[in-house]
């Protein structure tokens, strides 16, 4: 018995380890794992069903079939444990040892491992410096390779075909050694002297100029250094021994009819063994060379599919016409080992059922059907029954439970008391998709769910199912109760707003009870307190909507935390007074003294949470729900067809529109307008008509006439059921009502273009057949889009989680003072997101001063909460530098100060919070709501007129930013720089900025006062002017009629215009010699120079420019000498929605990206080539001029002689994030990506906190590229981790030349694959490539992320698991002297491997 206990003890032991290393296995190592050689291809005997000896399932090698019983049955039972039977050679042991025992096959000749041969770049090829094609010719016995040239003229590694080989034999005899096949490759690999090769390579790299060569050399150098560093021997890439996986991994299942379902691996192994045995026999018989040469490549071709089927061209197909599943396929993909078995497993103790509403539950409860509870908690019930002495054995307990005796139900009730269960609804898109509840036993078979948690599960009751899981261990129950309980998750982790907001019926009920009605029963009465109102209402003496006065006592919490009580009389309604009874103390009466629409209720709950705390809020939310349900029941709101009131004006509006359309049609018929103009006009018309109808309809619905107390007829807000539903936010919207009672309007075709004929009917009137048919387009497209969208969104989430999974808060403060500059987010002069919202929950990086003084009002290191936000807005501060995850300098993970507030909890983030995964979920979860379409700008969808002036929103002082301007003779200023802004500062010094284009005429001087609404700048939106900065005389250069220019005379006005011809329209002979330009000269005809430079004032004219001055004309400063027409109406597709978000996170370079200035300096144009212009920037600091060739069709925003700053736009287009990072730095990149992604989400009305996007961005920026290697061991172009590079820099000694590096932006997929952890990368994508690389370079995985730890089956180093890991490390450090360090072990291992290899 003692033995047995020891045995069980030994089984449960966990080996403690800190890292996993992957490497190449030497033949000796493979033999040491093996328990015997597999010699026969047979699996089991078809008659006896016993494994064949020496076969693939051989019991002698892999262990017994039954526990503790040998094959022939001589030894049975536990007492013979460890005995090896002399008859059948099987060891008596547990049957499951077969899962870990391996066999091997001794190969008759060496074979190249397909991963190291074919997985690009071919590792074998790199080491031998041969191409893959050449190596294959050797392997497949097409060519000889020279292994040792001896004293001959041949070279090592040279290929010889048969003829050449025999010639060489005749010429040199035995002086040289050449061979073919994998053996030859192995010899060559064995002969490589790494020490000898590395030195010359290191010296050669700095001397090479060609980029491609450097790349190739550094790849080779890296590979050699890796081999040298870890004791992998190159020749191990050629296999001489093949391991055989244990039998249970290739199981046999008997089917009817005496056949077996077998794993594909067995087929693949069988082919290898057959061919290997045949080859062995041939070698033993010393068969002719030609036969052997035929057999060896066949063996190579048998081993390749076993390791990776399909990697070498055509996959081998099994009997079921499908490719066989090889060893590599076992671990790849969604069905592979990593994703199927290691990262996610199916769990026991779980059930699922349909959900139904539980309106009587409390927020922390769920209704669990008794049947399910009985099944789920069975072991607990058995235990309790035995403990109580109601059952003597487990078997008896089982009987009791099956008979469902009354005692069992009592025990069950006791077992589930305070034992939370997890409820989960698929798809679990964010962490709120799994939550803990306390079960309440109910009859019936459906799980009951609290209505307020539906929002986070995205659940409805139309047949959704949910799963229940039981946390078993005490620790798990504690975590469920403390962390995952639904009552502890009131705020959304994505944006910090409450997520238990009532919806639908509840909102309707609350809205109904807080509306007011004119002349309701009891209007004008005055009440002493809320209780009196309640009594009178119940007695039926006052109506719910009656306007009354009531005296209230309210307690209000002040900002400093003190409580003030006051008593006042308020004008209110009966319903609002009743509602105030459930509001917790500490909130003022004003929060309910309004019609409670959905937004107001959300605000109320948020305020409640901030003022009175979690517990009160939960109770309040429940009370709100009960009240809402009660009053929506009483209200009797329903929908009848008469609620859809069709406005009387509809017929007139549609009639007018139809007439106008006819008019346009006749114009088109007589050729006055083009097809395109007609289409646009018609669509504009119908859009307008549609708006008018819906306005009329809403006006009609929203008001009703009633008689007041004086008997006069007055208007009040309508009590129309449908209007109330839409207005309260309970359901429906103006757009939906428009389709029911207005007109359906214009429909789009599946390709996004709009159909000219609108649907003038609505659903109440009914649609005609044609109208119905037109509308089916849209409906179908919607469904198809949704299906595609879900898959894409899920994949985006998966990539995000993968890139951010190892980001955990690991320390309080990293000590950096870097941060992002936060300003209000402004679009077109409107504040979309005020500064307060953006800095809420962030830590201030540098002191904030009071505007215009040196007083610090917010010190650095402050965590900004709601009170600080008020304070910042009061002091009208317009920018704050806050800490950001992008700038955090923590080596592994991130620090709490850079992250700031934990959005779901409302306080500074705890150490151990997995902020990376939370960020990924917050961005990915709303992904399904984003659209998939790319929008066509054009048509009626969004045609906005081009802006042509700046109108000031708020008055103030004018000031210009980054603006070059010249003063015209009439006193107006003209902007002559690209990225200038006009800033209007209000009395607090807060600035509102307006962008000004080149050539804008500005009517406000520096420091001048401006009134609100004044127009301060104007420009022509359709042309791009060229403005002179000088006074002088115009001379034309290179302008010859009909060669470079053509004159056009306008017939109506009689004015002549000069238009510059496009290059391709000019005569071929003089196409490139003449460059039309306008030159400025003074009265004497001498060249004038641009102000402040020695560049002659010469303006080169691009194609299609219109010149508005005559040769020899006198012009003044700021005059327009030429205009370039802008094509405003060009429709460019802008990618919207999900694809846009994915593009940004993948850091893809957009097509025709904008061109930015690489250096600050003066613009000039050099010699043109055929299709390109040469742009030259002469830097202001006097360094080498920078040249760039730009295609001629690109429209340039700069002119000769203009000053530009580094990073300014030279040619418009979508921005390339790489350029922004390189030229403007990390902060600018952060701002750009933040704003772009937020724009997409904002359009859908989704709120996501900026810091989630920054968190992902930090992971995309985690690598740096070495630009100068200095004295370090790096090579130019290497990539390494950013925090590590900083440390490397800091730790370099004084005299060492430190390596220089630049930050690199990687897309999320690239970043995931280049993590330090190979386990995480391999379980993500491209498993083969990742593992090959890791094995060759002998990578170590230090198991720092979450994924790696899940794979090896440990607690994750986040949350409660972080404490466990910290404690484990501490314990280990305490035991240090007793243990050997990992590096010592590795050294010993390497030595052992080397000696075994040699």
From Swiss-Prot:
It catalyses: RNA(n) + a ribonucleoside 5'-triphosphate = RNA(n+1) + diphosphate. Disulfide bonds: none annotated. Zn(2+) 1 binds at residues 70, 72, 85, 88. The keyword Acyltransferase does not apply. SMART domains: RPOLA_N (SM00663). The keyword Transcription applies. One of its GO terms (molecular function) is DNA-directed RNA polymerase activity. It is an enzyme of class 2 (transferase). Its EC number is 2.7.7.6. It comes from the Bacteria. GO terms for biological process: DNA-templated transcription. Zn(2+) 2 binds at residues 814, 888, 895, 898. Belongs to the RNA polymerase beta' chain family. DNA-dependent RNA polymerase catalyzes the transcription of DNA into RNA using the four ribonucleoside triphosphates as substrates. The RNAP catalytic core consists of 2 alpha, 1 beta, 1 beta' and 1 omega subunit. When a sigma factor is associated with the core the holoenzyme is formed, which can initiate transcription. This is DNA-directed RNA polymerase subunit beta'. The gene is rpoC.
